[in-house]
């Protein structure tokens, strides 16, 4: 293990992604997660893909190049460790560990998609299977497992290119185990974004992997309930964090598109939440294409907001979605290329 203190940059960087948890789960919940993770070894391995949802994740080419160079920037911390596997970084920072176990960095390596990037993606993915695939380690939380499954399904060709039959079997065996874990533990994910992420991962796996379609209908119904309970009538969420709301919209459009692409209709409450959120985010869009920054949210990756809004527009049947009055408690003024967004709402819950 490599002590992170040897590699810390002089100045911590701004967080890359929105934190999805207000704290650690209770000890009892963690014990139940650990038990379910260990029991996931009883799951039947998936044999292959029925179909793969079209990859919709957006990675950063620049961050991907930094990862290849050995610069790991997660959770507001930059660790410089050239030639060190990602699982050997010992930061002692739970948020850092959550981000690497969620595999969102796989989007960045796929954005580079050259030989060195693919080598690292494969080494780190199969390294995770070797070290943690039997239910060990901090990555067995429902929201992290859902996030990881989405990336593994999206980038399966990237990860499996040139792999041996034994490695391919290990990959599908791990997908089956993680799907079983999610099916048992998604309810324990915190309500809102973490639970939506867990359910979206379960839907992706159920639609994509042979023999797992039984999980799709219950997960789709649960996602619709979460939409009804957590997205208010104005398309807002309790945290009032614009970037977190963009995360929610992104996951909902991914799930809806995957369901539609497989010939299944998304639930009415699911589509209604997308229709409510989109105009709220459009009102929070700055002239440069980024989000207004409030309550811990950042502007988002270039092109992320526009892609999410375009997908929401397509799912709405091409209907114009426009906010009227305040949007999640924010007011907007605009003239030409100048926009002003004002927080005029109650404090976040």
Q: Where is each model-derived feature located?
A:
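Extreme N-terminal leader/anchor segments
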Residues: 1-82
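CBM-like, beta-strand-rich accessory domains located in the C-terminal region of large
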Residues: 2-3, 88, 94, 146
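Preference for long, amphipathic alpha-helical scaffolds in soluble/luminal domains
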Residues: 57-81, 178-181, 185, 218, ...
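Sequence-level motif detector for i,i+2 pairs with an aromatic at +2
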Residues: 67-69, 82-84, 100, 328, ...
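Asp/Glu-centered strand-loop micro-motifs enriched in Gly/Pro and often flanked by an aromatic residue
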Residues: 74-77, 81-96, 110-112
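Pocket-edge structural micro-motifs
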Residues: 76, 89, 107, 334-335, ...
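Aromatic-lined, polymer-binding surfaces characteristic
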Residues: 93-274
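Carbohydrate-active enzyme catalytic cores, enriched for enzymes
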Residues: 232-349
């Amino acid at each position: 293990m490599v002590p992170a203190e040897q590699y810390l940059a002089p100045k911590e960087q701004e967080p890359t992604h929105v934190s999805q948890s207000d704290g650690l789960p209770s000890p009892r919940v963690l014990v139940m997660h650990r038990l379910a993770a260990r029991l996931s070894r009883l799951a039947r391995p998936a044999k292959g893909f029925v179909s793969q949802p079209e990859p919709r994740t957006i990675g950063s080419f620049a961050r991907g190049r930094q990862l290849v160079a050995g610069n790991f920037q997660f959770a507001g911390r930059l660790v410089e460790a050239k030639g060190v596997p990602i699982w050997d970084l010992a930061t002692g920072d739970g948020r850092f560990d959550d981000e690497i176990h969620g595999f969102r960095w796989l989007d960045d390596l796929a954005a580079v998609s050259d030989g060195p990037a693919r080598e690292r993606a494969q080494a780190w993915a199969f390294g995770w299977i070797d070290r943690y695939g039997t239910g060990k380690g901090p990555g067995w939380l429902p929201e992290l497992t859902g996030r990881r499954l989405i990336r593994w399904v999206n980038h399966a060709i990237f990860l499996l290119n040139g792999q041996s039959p034994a490695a391919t079997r290990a990959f599908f065996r791990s997908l089956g185990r993680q799907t079983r874990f999610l099916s048992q533990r998604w309810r324990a994910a915190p309500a809102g974004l973490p639970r939506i992420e867990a359910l979206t991962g379960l839907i992706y796996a159920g639609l994509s992997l042979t023999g797992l379609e039984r999980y799709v209908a219950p997960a789709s119904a649960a996602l619709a309930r979460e939409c009804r309970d957590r997205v208010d009538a104005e398309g807002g969420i309790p945290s009032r964090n614009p970037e977190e709301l963009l995360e929610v919209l992104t996951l909902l459009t991914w799930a809806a598109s995957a369901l539609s692409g497989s010939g299944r209709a998304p639930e009415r409450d699911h589509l209604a939440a997308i229709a409510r959120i989109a105009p709220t985010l459009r009102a929070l869009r700055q002239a440069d294409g980024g989000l207004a920054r409030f309550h811990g949210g950042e502007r988002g990756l270039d092109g992320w907001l526009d892609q999410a809004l375009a997908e929401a527009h397509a799912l709405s049947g091409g209907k114009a979605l426009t906010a009227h009055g305040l949007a999640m408690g924010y007011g907007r003024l605009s003239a030409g290329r100048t926009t002003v967004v004002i927080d005029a709402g109650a404090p976040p819950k």
